[in-house]
Regions:
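Conserved FAD/dinucleotide-binding core of flavoprotein oxidoreductases
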Residues: 45-85
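Mid-domain catalytic core of redox enzymes
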Residues: 1-44
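A glycine-rich dinucleotide-binding beta-alpha-beta segment and adjacent secondary-structure elements
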Residues: 26-32, 92-161
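Acidic/polar loop patches that form or flank catalytic/metal-binding clefts of enzymes
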Residues: 1-2, 96-102, 184-189
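Short conserved micro-motifs at the rims of enzyme active sites and ligand-binding pockets
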Residues: 1, 16-17, 43-46, 62-67, ...
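C-terminal structured subdomain/cap of oxidoreductase catalytic cores
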Residues: 48, 74, 78-86, 124-190
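Short, glycine-/Ser/Thr-/acidic-enriched flexible segments
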Residues: 9-12, 36-40, 58-60, 129-131, ...
Length: 190
């Protein structure tokens, strides 16, 4: 598959979610993982594969539910230790995986925020993915749709419904609304 979600079962997902809600780095992080060259062979040299994975961490780390001493400072040591935890998750489900890894590139929440100021505290969701920021409440009550009070300005970022992680969803919503508005202007001249 091009993209897989990695967790043993719903109970493990529930535990990881509870750990995140308490501000703890999950002992067994839930992963979204993919292989670029499965859908685009030009993304990796012939005979090789490029894999990526991401997980969620608390916006404010209060502790580590794993057997480590991670604090959320995301020093090089902490980034490497958490990446190892992620690799161990994959290794448990795909024995031999770690022996195939030739290199890795780690983007911590702080690095994400440096690369894109829209990613508040490094969140790909443009903020939080908690319930109070979903559906009609995203990004704030009254702006839960792509339309804004500014004519021909539409919300299309991870901060808009349905949020980050629904890759392309906010942009598709905004494009649909913009195209419909354009058609109405052509037909009705308004």
């Amino acid at each position: 598959a091009g993209v897989v979600h990695v967790a043993d079962d719903i109970d493990e997902l529930t535990v990881a979610g509870a750990q995140l809600a308490r501000g703890l780095l999950p002992a067994k992080p839930f992963l979204v993982m993919g292989q670029y060259s499965m859908v685009d062979p030009t993304r990796s040299p012939a005979g090789t594969e490029t894999a990526w994975a991401y997980t969620h961490v608390p916006r404010e780390v209060r502790g580590d539910a794993g057997d480590g001493d991670l604090t959320g400072a995301w020093t090089e040591r902490e980034a490497q230790a958490f990446a190892l935890r992620i690799e161990q998750r994959v290794e448990a489900l795909a024995p031999g995986f770690r022996g195939l890894v030739r290199g890795r590139h780690i983007l911590t929440p702080g690095r994400f925020a440096e690369l894109d100021r829209n990613l508040d505290r490094g969140s790909m969701h443009g903020g939080t993915a908690q319930l109070h920021q979903q559906a009609i409440f995203r990004p704030t009550p009254g702006l839960g749709r792509p339309e804004t009070p500014v004519e021909r300005l539409y919300l299309a970022s991870a901060s808009a419904h349905p949020g980050g992680g629904v890759h392309g969803g906010p942009g598709a919503n905004a494009a649909r609304v913009a195209l419909n508005a354009h058609r109405r202007r052509r037909v009705f001249g308004a």
